[in-house]
From Swiss-Prot:
Catalyzes the dehydration of dTDP-D-glucose to form dTDP-6-deoxy-D-xylo-4-hexulose via a three-step process involving oxidation, dehydration and reduction. Its EC number is 4.2.1.46. The active site is at D134 (proton donor), E135 (proton acceptor), Y158 (proton acceptor). InterPro entries: dTDP_Gluc_deHydtase, NAD(P)-bd_dom, NAD(P)-bd_dom_sf. This is dTDP-glucose 4,6-dehydratase. It is an enzyme of class 4 (lyase). The gene is rfbB. NAD(+) binds at residues 12-13, 32-35, 58-59, 80-84, 99, 158-162, 188. Pathway: Carbohydrate biosynthesis; dTDP-L-rhamnose biosynthesis; Bacterial outer membrane biogenesis; LPS O-antigen biosynthesis. The lineage of its organism: Bacteria, Pseudomonadati, Pseudomonadota, Gammaproteobacteria, Lysobacterales.
């Protein structure tokens, strides 16, 4: 049985990834600091499962990481741990530098020392996979797509911190020989998404009868990737990716933000109509745009398709329908999040 050390597993993408990995027979050791967006309820179904080991801790704690590596002898380390919300990075960039840059460096140092001490056969097979974002590339005009050779041009404190972490991962490969892989993904959506991000925020506010905030003119474009597709892409890169390479992961589903909000409203009108009969779109409220808001992201994932045979299985229409249905049937999970410190308020609106 393979063993993976996964960081950030109580978050959105990491949580979905761990659920799928354990179901596929992987032994997973989880390290998570349980910051505001981490939710143990995401993995409640794994409680008591001997193939799932949870450790509360920070990737920046090199001694702890070293102990876990020595104790559990993983065949791979997958780094999902990150502060990831752009609005929060505008309000307080320090936490993003600490986790995404300083924390990644500490993790890399511990993993490098562990990897160097492995027997030859295990050392050759070992991989460190770093999960990153397309936001490191900056913004696009009306045409074109990000490729793996697009120059980095991050525009927010969040994307700058992730760019720095990407560069550290690359440097540890070229300097020390650490067998790394990096994935840069487009906007994810799906179950267990913390409701500060657009799609779960709109669902939660719509059901609460509150205004649905749309930044600026709502015509910012994002490529939307269903989280299950992303998890499959990561497994594919881990299994077959070329060491030292970066792979872009996209959903082939470019949509304006306003189109995403309208699609959610239509699904809620169908499955959970308002008592007064009014359409959910009547709740849309255009608000002041985010400072430095990137206009368009688009991913060219042809390298991943051509080299490794991966492409998304879900269309946006399929994925968003499944996502809305999940939130409607899992309101206990949502309420558990809202019973914490977050109350669907806007963050980072001014500089």
């Amino acid at each position: 049985m393979a063993t993976w050390l996964v960081t950030g597993r109580a978050g959105f993408i990491g949580g979905n990834f761990v659920l799928e990995a354990v179901s596929r027979g992987i032994r997973v050791v989880n390290l998570d600091a349980l910051t505001y967006a981490g939710n143990l309820n995401t993995l409640a179904s794994l409680e008591g499962n001997a193939d799932h080991i949870f450790v509360k801790g920070d990737i920046g704690d090199g001694a702890l990481v070293t102990r876990l590596l020595q104790e559990h002898q993983p065949d791979a380390v997958l780094n999902f741990a990150a502060e990831s919300h752009v609005d929060r990075s505008i309000e307080g960039p320090g936490a993003f530098i600490q986790t995404n840059v300083v924390g990644t460096l500490a993790l890399l140092e511990a993993v490098r020392d562990y990897w160097k001490a492995l027997p030859d056969t295990r050392r050759d097979a070992f991989r460190f996979l770093h999960v990153s974002t397309d936001e490191v590339y900056g913004t696009l005009g009306e045409t074109g797509k990000f490729t793996e050779t697009t120059p980095y041009a991050p525009n927010s404190p969040y994307s700058a911190s992730k760019a720095a972490s990407d560069h550290l991962v690359r440097a540890f490969h070229h300097t020390y020989g650490l067998p790394v892989l990096t994935t840069n993904c487009s906007n994810n959506y799906g179950p267990y998404h913390f409701p500060e991000k657009l799609i779960p925020l709109v669902i939660a506010k719509a059901l609460a009868g509150e205004p649905l905030p749309v930044y600026g003119d709502g015509k910012q474009v994002r490529d939307w990737l269903f989280v299950s597709d992303h998890c499959e892409a990561i497994r594919t890169v881990l299994a077959k990716g070329r060491v030292g390479e970066t792979y872009n992961v996209g959903g082939n589903s470019e949509r304006q933000n306003i189109e995403v909000v309208q699609a959610i409203c239509a699904l809620l009108d169908q499955h959970r109509p308002r008592e007064d009969g009014k359409p959910r779109e009547s709740q849309i409220a255009y608000v002041t745009d985010r400072p430095g808001h990137d206009r368009r992201y688009a991913i060219d994932a042809s390298k991943l398709k051509d080299e490794l045979g991966w492409e998304p299985a879900y269309t946006f229409e399929q994925g968003i329908a499944q996502t809305v249905d999940w939130y409607l049937t899992n309101q206990t999970w949502v309420q558990g999040v809202l019973d914490g410190s977050y109350r669907l308020e806007r963050i980072g609106a001014t500089v």
